[in-house]
């Protein structure tokens, strides 16, 4: 099926969509740009996903980044070097499940905005998080802005 412009996988690459999705998305794009977070991760094919690029974020939303790594241990050491000095830095290894391979999960804050990096041996655009975001984007497109606001309201109330 052909999707309207803006709903294809290419439309979600980089920070362009993030910068225009919402005020918090613009803040997130600015932080990613100023601190060169995606440039630092360029060898791992980073993709920003989640509620921020969709414009359905709430105050507690974080920046979610998917990465593709061939060696989890090496990526963990890289992350320690690259992000270890950021506030709240943590890193853990997540065991494989029936649906997702083993992963390294990195969390830290940058200017008060939480960032989570999920790195596994699968290309970012093939990971469930990216596919899930595309499905959400298409549902939001079909259902319209009113539906998106209802989703945000539900997220606010837990």
Give residue spans per PLM region:
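Helical scaffold of the NTase/Pol beta-like nucleotidyltransferase catalytic core
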Residues: 1-49
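Metal-dependent nucleotidyltransferase catalytic core
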Residues: 16, 20-34, 69-111
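Active-site nucleotide-donor binding segment shared across nucleotidyl transfer reactions
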Residues: 35-74
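Hydrophobic N-terminal alpha-helices or hydrophobic patches in metabolic proteins across all domains
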Residues: 42, 97, 127-130
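Hydrophobic anchor at the start of a short beta-strand
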Residues: 46, 86, 115
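"Short basic amphipathic alpha-helical interaction patches in structured regions
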Residues: 78-82, 121, 131-133
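A eukaryotic "domain-to-IDR transition" signal
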Residues: 105, 109, 113-118, 125-126
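Catalytic cores of NTP-dependent nucleotidyl/adenyl transfer enzymes across multiple folds
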Residues: 123-158
């Amino acid at each position: 099926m052909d999707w309207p412009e803006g709903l294809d996988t290419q439309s979600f690459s980089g920070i362009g969509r993030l910068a225009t999705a919402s005020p918090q998305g613009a803040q997130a794009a600015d932080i990613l740009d100023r601190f060169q977070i995606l440039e630092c991760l360029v060898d791992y094919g980073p993709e920003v996903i989640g509620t921020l690029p969709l414009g359905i974020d709430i105050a507690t939303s974080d920046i979610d980044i998917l990465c593709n790594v061939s060696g989890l241990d090496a990526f963990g050491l890289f992350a320690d070097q690259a992000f270890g000095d950021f506030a709240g830095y943590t890193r853990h290894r997540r065991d494989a499940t029936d649906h997702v391979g083993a992963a390294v999960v990195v969390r830290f804050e940058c200017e008060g905005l939480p960032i989570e990096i999920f790195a596994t041996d699968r290309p970012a655009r093939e990971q469930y998080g990216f596919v899930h975001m595309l499905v959400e984007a298409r549902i939001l497109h079909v259902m319209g802005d009113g539906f998106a606001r209802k989703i945000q309201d539900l997220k606010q109330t837990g």
